């Protein structure tokens, strides 16, 4: 438990102290966000606000994670980084770097368009497939890998193996699934990052839920507690530490990103957090449960899909603007009202998800 607290606290401190340094540096260098002309008119006043604040989030997560492990040397239970934790951390940093390239191109060209779609999808594919391949390696002494090829809700669904038939074909199907998952979640968080504090606040809530669930998995791991309700997760404690680091980093950044935002996380932050969300869902065996906990991200994405499909097929737009947070904003809701209400919705989704997780455990005991 102490490792989790240290990781979250250190990440919060790093983020809250490092973010203003980035604000001053980026302001001095004129690295400000360009605002799309077709966006809400009220957002034009945000033009020039420093961006790429996701750098602080990534540094905070990495720093908190490794310092938590370093501090564990001085506690009764020394704990080393694990394959699962390092793989999710690597995916987070890799997605963040991809987002950084996107942000940098936007700033270099002074327009709100960065990497083209093909370039971004290719980068996501390389990172997702690399993550997926490595997740099938690193077998521990209990015969567990960082990921399972079986689809999971709260735990593996034994009758639903994604790698149908096994072998090379089965592995390729599994890697395709991982690619879809990573791409979907990273883009979903990216779409949510459209209002001051929205993505940071909602992701913080999701990270809190995952820190709780993975700690419960650790306390009831089959490696130490071979009960009928135990969890077949390779490194649950390390995942809990990493989720706590994500929580702390988001809260520390939110201090400066809350309305009126002094800095934006940019694609650097949103893609990194999307990678963290996807990685945690895979390594904790909760891919389907993440849809419940991260339902707001799902709603944001679906609103864009509906808007595009409807306009292309009928010429009509069902929403005033997509993603859906802009629909409410253009409908007269104040930006802060939309953000706070979406935080509340995310909290309710998180409670529902954690309740389902715990209800499953009760059903087995």
UniProtKB/Swiss-Prot annotation:
One of its GO terms (biological process) is peptidoglycan biosynthetic process. It catalyses: UDP-N-acetyl-alpha-D-muramoyl-L-alanyl-gamma-D-glutamyl-meso-2,6-diaminopimeloyl-D-alanyl-D-alanine + di-trans,octa-cis-undecaprenyl phosphate = di-trans,octa-cis-undecaprenyl diphospho-N-acetyl-alpha-D-muramoyl-L-alanyl-D-glutamyl-meso-2,6-diaminopimeloyl-D-alanyl-D-alanine + UMP. The lineage of its organism: Bacteria, Bacillati, Actinomycetota, Actinomycetes, Mycobacteriales. Keywords: Cell cycle, Cell division, Cell membrane, Cell shape, Cell wall biogenesis/degradation, Magnesium, Membrane, Metal-binding, Peptidoglycan synthesis, Transferase, Transmembrane, Transmembrane helix. One of its GO terms (molecular function) is UDP-N-acetylmuramoyl-L-alanyl-D-glutamyl-meso-2,6-diaminopimelyl-D-alanyl-D-alanine:undecaprenyl-phosphate transferase activity. It is found in: Cell membrane. This is Phospho-N-acetylmuramoyl-pentapeptide-transferase. It is a multi-pass membrane protein.
């Amino acid at each position: 438990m102490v490792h989790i607290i240290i990781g979250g606290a250190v990440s919060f401190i790093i983020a809250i102290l490092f973010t203003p340094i980035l604000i001053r540096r980026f302001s001095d260098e004129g690295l400000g966000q360009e605002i799309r002309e077709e966006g809400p008119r009220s957002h034009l006043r945000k033009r020039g606000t420093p961006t790429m604040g996701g750098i602080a989030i990534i540094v905070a997560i990495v720093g908190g994670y490794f310092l938590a492990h370093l501090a564990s040397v001085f506690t009764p239970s020394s704990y080393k980084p694990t394959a699962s934790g390092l793989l999710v951390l690597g995916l987070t940093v890799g997605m963040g770097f991809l987002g950084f390239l996107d942000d940098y191109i936007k700033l270099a060209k002074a327009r709100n368009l960065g990497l083209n779609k093909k370039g971004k999808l290719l980068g996501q594919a390389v990172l997702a497939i690399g993550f997926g391949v490595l997740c099938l390696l690193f077998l521990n002494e209990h015969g567990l890998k960082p990921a399972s090829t079986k689809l999971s809700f709260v735990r593996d669904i034994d009758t639903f193996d994604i790698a149908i038939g096994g072998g090379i074909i089965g592995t390729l199907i599994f890697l395709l699934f991982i690619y879809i998952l990573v791409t979907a979640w990273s883009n979903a968080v990216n779409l949510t990052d459209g209002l001051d504090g929205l993505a940071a606040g909602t992701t913080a809530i999701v990270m809190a839920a995952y820190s709780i669930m993975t700690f419960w998995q650790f306390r009831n791991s089959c490696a130490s507690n071979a009960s009928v309700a135990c969890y077949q997760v390779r490194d649950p404690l390390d995942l809990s530490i990493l989720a706590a680091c994500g929580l702390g980093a988001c809260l520390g950044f939110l201090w400066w990103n809350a309305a009126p935002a002094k800095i934006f996380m940019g694609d650097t932050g949103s893609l990194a957090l999307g990678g963290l969300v996807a990685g945690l869902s895979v390594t904790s065996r909760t891919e389907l449960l993440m849809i419940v906990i991260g339902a707001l991200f799902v709603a944001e994405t679906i609103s864009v899909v509906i808007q595009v499909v409807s306009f292309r097929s009928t010429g009509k737009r069902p929403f005033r603007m997509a993603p859906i947070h802009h629909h409410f904003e253009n409908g007269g809701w104040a930006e802060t009202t939309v953000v706070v209400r979406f935080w509340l919705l995310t909290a309710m989704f998180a409670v529902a998800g954690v309740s389902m997780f715990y209800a499953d455990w009760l059903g087995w005991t």
